[in-house]
Amino acid sequence: MARTTPISRYRNIGISAHIDAGKTTTTERILFYTGVNHKIGEVHDGAATMDWMEQEQERGITITSAATTAFWSGMAKQFEPHRINIIDTPGHVDFTIEVERSMRVLDGAVMVYCAVGGVQPQSETVWRQANKYHVPRIAFVNKMDRMGANFLKVVNQIKTRLGANPVPLQLAIGAEEAFTGIVDLVKMKAINWNEADQGVTFTYEDIPADMVELANEWHQFLVESAAEASEELMDKYLGGETLSEEEIKNALRQRVLNNEIILVTCGSAFKNKGVQAMLDAVIEYLPSPTDVPAIKGILDDGKDTPAERHSDDNEPFAALAFKIATDPFVGNLTFFRVYSGVVNSGDTVLNSVKSARERFGRIVQMHANKREEIKEVRAGDIAAAIGLKDVTTGDTLCDQNAPIILERMEFPEPVISIAVEPKTKADQEKMGLALGRLAKEDPSFRVRTDEESNQTIISGMGELHLEIIVDRMKREFNVEANVGKPQVAYRETIRDTVKDVEGKHAKQSGGRGQYGHVVIDMFPLEPGGEGYTFTNDIKGGVIPGEYIPAVDKGIQEQLKSGPMAGYPVVDLGVRLHFGSYHDVDSSELAFKLAASLAFKEAFKRAKPVLLEPIMKVEVETPEDYMGDVIGDLNRRRGMIEGMEDTATGKTVRAQVPLSEMFGYATDLRSQTQGRASYSMEFLKYAEAPTNVAQAVIEARGK
């Protein structure tokens, strides 16, 4: 099969936004205008096409990032058909893993902002993730028809809050109920969409008289921003020459691809205005797979030799699995992005991360929750495979004769845990299977069995994250579970350096004895660094080399469950510098036990402390409740970092220990009569005050 769409006409984009910016509605409209969807789904009545899990439709928030393919030839059919692969990303902070994961496989992004709420806390998180992966982006300021909508205010917030360089491509004509269309600042024409056909057709008109001055001012700004792309254009512009429409567009595109500017469009997805022009901007300004740098990886040659793959059908096949989803009819769906080469259904490829072969049984192109079976995929494609056996998020699938490992994704450590048990004993096995499958889909979710209590413990990124996991067990696997109280993931560490601490394990009672003797130093390491280091400074063979790994292992086993309260130990180094052994009685086990004794003793002497997770909390509240909100955060041991005005009141930024934040959503609702909202994400570990640490240690000791 030959390629049907040249790779230069591909756009792999993500649509990212804060929870209520109207992202799903925007995606729906894209699907409608690109002719995929014949009836527009509304989130309000739970019918949106992209939100395909039952819970998403109930909660009205997007949880799973679904991938969809659509074609667009421009509002005025001015382009050849372009293929747009859209990844819908969740906007809730508990699902930032999904956002991170999709940013990894995108070439460009559309950031959706609410014209009333502007740049919200979650938008900043998503922005940072897009920066991390150098994703070129444009913005769409949605909900221009809502009370309090203000386009230029949001443009200013993109500058001040995100530290970006926004350049409006358009201006809104009117706002709130009077919002009727937009001014195209490149063409210097007004665009009005036809309401009778839901905005499929439009007319170019003259700019309204009362907007001419403002439009000229912003047109100048736009042209100047374009001219900054090259000295040649700058000279032309400064020399008073007019830049052609093509020159302006090419220059702006160059600057977007270099991440120097963010072009800002506007509209109201709900009122069928603006999404069409935003789609044109996606084609004109966002990158094709050939516009972005080749993907980097390492060769599987034992030396980690750097390598890369270009977006080209003729290069060896390489793809990245970025999401595993469970489908009610076909089982596991593995979403993957093809970076190079071609693969056909029925082909066998290599999972280079696990050194295992996988066969592509069937390949499907997803349209939200509908699917179309296809025979092959090529460089630049995003598709899903059915029947892959052992692929995890972040694995590389590649040509068996040209193995490469593409960059691995980094996943955050969970910060909250709860115990779960099935309501009936019969469901125990089913629950294990369900949790195993959910953990495969979501690397930020972990499952383990507590050795002491034998309870099943699930851990994740926040209360909502775990609530949804429990909910999915019930819906998708028919397992009802009882849930315990949330537990905080504390850590243990030390503050002092101690030297020459001995550990001796000696047993002489008939038969072969056991003998191991070590002397260690222990010292604190920088937080957030390596976590643990082991240095072997044994001189003159006082401990034979074959026992050294056993000493390291003995210490590492102690790190899993610290001496204070059984929490993992972090940020410390151990130096082994002396000891003794016995020709007959010494063994690896004896040295392992000696090391663990030395570790416990050294830890006790080195000023041990308990670390607790601190969350970055942002609360948006009407001004009337400001005092209550701040008072409540202070009571929760919060440290207020600052406040700023928003369109609807104030935003309070604080750092608060996670242990104090349980049930906060309910308390905040009752304090503010449901008018405030908050977002929370993990920030760092910090030393817990003595009284808190004492209470935790006592509770663990019971």
Swiss-Prot record:
Annotated localization: Cytoplasm
Keyword presence, Cytoplasm: yes
Keywords: Cytoplasm, Elongation factor, GTP-binding, Nucleotide-binding, Protein biosynthesis
Domain of life: Bacteria
Domain tr-type G: 8-290
Record PROSITE patterns: G_TR_1, G_TR_2
GO CC annotations, alphabetized: cytoplasm
GO MF term list: GTP binding; GTPase activity; guanosine tetraphosphate binding; translation elongation factor activity
Any single GO BP term: ribosome disassembly
InterPro entries listed in its UniProt record: EFG_II, EFG_III, EFG_III/V, EFG_IV, EFG_V, EFG_V-like, EFTu-like_2, G_TR_CS
Residues at which GTP binds: 17-24, 88-92, 142-145
NCBIfam families (UniProt xref): EF-G, PRK12740.1-5, small_GTP
Family: Belongs to the TRAFAC class translation factor GTPase superfamily. Classic translation factor GTPase family. EF-G/EF-2 subfamily.
Function: Catalyzes the GTP-dependent ribosomal translocation step during translation elongation. During this step, the ribosome changes from the pre-translocational (PRE) to the post-translocational (POST) state as the newly formed A-site-bound peptidyl-tRNA and P-site-bound deacylated tRNA move to the P and E sites, respectively. Catalyzes the coordinated movement of the two tRNA molecules, the mRNA and conformational changes in the ribosome.
Entries under PANTHER family matching the protein: RIBOSOME-RELEASING FACTOR 2, MITOCHONDRIAL (PTHR43261:SF1), TRANSLATION ELONGATION FACTOR G-RELATED (PTHR43261)
Protein name: Elongation factor G
Organism: Edwardsiella ictaluri (strain 93-146)
Lineage: Bacteria, Pseudomonadati, Pseudomonadota, Gammaproteobacteria, Enterobacterales
Gene this chain is encoded by: fusA
